[in-house]
A protein has these predicted regions:
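Conserved donor-binding/catalytic core segment of Leloir-type glycosyltransferases
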Residues: 138, 172-191, 197-201
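Short glycine/serine-rich donor-binding loops of glycosyltransferases
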Residues: 264-267, 285
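Short hydrophobic beta-strand element within catalytic cores of glycosyltransferases
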Residues: 276-279, 289
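A short, well-ordered alpha-helix in the C-terminal region of glycosyltransferases
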Residues: 305, 312, 319-333, 342-345, ...
Length: 352
């Protein structure tokens, strides 16, 4: 159960991967999307919505990852639309809030926490309450696990999301004479895009050459980004699958400037394509970003630290290549088959 499905995100990609792998192993999997909330005083709209049926979109509606599961969008958030099941998985805090109120026959509730959302959502108090739910919780990093234990007294199973090595790979790394630095654009301030741009500008101001490569799904026309940065750069809008892989492979360094991440799949994907990683300590990234070993890590919002680490890789080819190789090995430690087996095991244990 999710609260949206159109937006390309690391979390959504991971959830679709888990769901489709479970389906391919013979499990019956259904994918429900919550209805958009209706204001409490609009009883007319609530009545109309309650008379509608679930809208089912074909699997190919998801055009940015492989998917064989129809998307079922609820007309209104009511238990009558949810079938009886063995397991019910909530994802975003909105889904956990709804799922926790459903009767037991809708399935044993698992809350798959992909981020500590109360850090950035407008509905902080509501999100915080969901972490106190007594259901079983799965998290994608020890950083989230520690937050749940320290702030809510809740334990959780850690299931680090792997990278699909059949999709993200690099047959033979080719290094660019002028290093290409890749980063993600996002309009959430905590994604740190502006910090990353400032770090890149500082590196350029100190006389270093680089080619900036930015990708994202928020802006089809990158001109506002060019205007804000004060220079133009290579931009890719909603790259998916092979286009995304080729973009990673063409770059030398991946720059992550987020303030916090539940895990940070874009950095992992880039590392699988043999990019060297320069990142802030986002919390979740510590599953794979080991400072001076698999990445160069600075503190969040530390633009000086980010620019310093970028310069180190621009000036030190041996360090650049060693981080690439060790980072690649680290990412390969995470395996989809093992993760799915662990997930199924958790589900089975809850039913005994």
């Amino acid at each position: 159960m999710v609260n949206q499905y159109v937006r390309i995100s690391g979390g959504n990609r991971a959830l679709f991967e888990f769901a489709n792998r479970l389906k391919s192993e013979g499990h019956e999997v259904r994918w429900f999307v919550l209805a958009k909330p209706i204001k409490w005083y609009r009883w007319d709209k609530k009545i109309i919505a309650s008379m509608k049926r679930v809208v089912t979109a074909p699997p190919e509606t998801i055009d940015w990852t492989d998917n064989a599961i129809p998307i079922e969008v609820l007309p209104v958030n009511h238990s009558k639309y949810i079938p009886e099941a063995d397991i019910l998985v909530a994802t975003a805090w909105q889904t956990a809030d709804f799922a926790a109120k459903l009767p037991r026959e809708k399935g044993v509730l698992f809350y798959f926490v992909l981020h500590y959302e109360s850090l950035w959502t407008r509905y902080k108090s509501q999100a915080l309450k969901t972490y106190d739910l007594s259901c079983q919780k799965i998290v994608c990093s020890n950083w989230i696990k520690n937050n749940l234990m320290e702030k809510h007294g809740q334990d959780a199973h850690v299931l680090v999301i792997p990278v699909d090595q059949k999709l993200f790979y690099c047959d033979k790394k080719k290094w660019n004479a002028t290093r290409r630095v890749c980063m993600l654009h996002h309009d959430y301030d905590w994604k740190g895009y502006e910090d990353g741009i400032k770090a890149v500008k500082e590196v350029i101001a100190q006389g270093h050459d680089l080619e900036l490569v930015v990708f994202g799904e928020k802006l089809k026309d990158p001109q506002p980004l060019f205007d804000a940065a004060g220079f133009e750069f290579e931009y890719h809008y909603r790259p998916a699958r092979e286009k995304l892989r080729k973009m990673y492979v063409s770059c030398d360094i991946f720059l992550c400037s987020s303030w916090y991440e539940g895990l940070g799949l874009t950095g992992m994907e880039a590392m699988a394509c043999r990019c060297s990683l320069v990142t802030t300590n986002t919390g979740g990234c510590l599953e794979y970003a080991i400072d001076e070993k698999t990445a160069l890590v600075s503190e969040p919002r530390d633009i000086v630290g980010l620019s310093r680490n970028l310069i180190r890789l621009l000036e030190d080819e041996a360090l650049l290549k060693s981080l690439s190789e060790d980072g690649y090995r680290k990412i390969n430690e995470f395996n989809w088959e093992e993760s799915c087996d662990r997930l199924i095991c958790l589900f089975n244990e809850s039913l005994t």
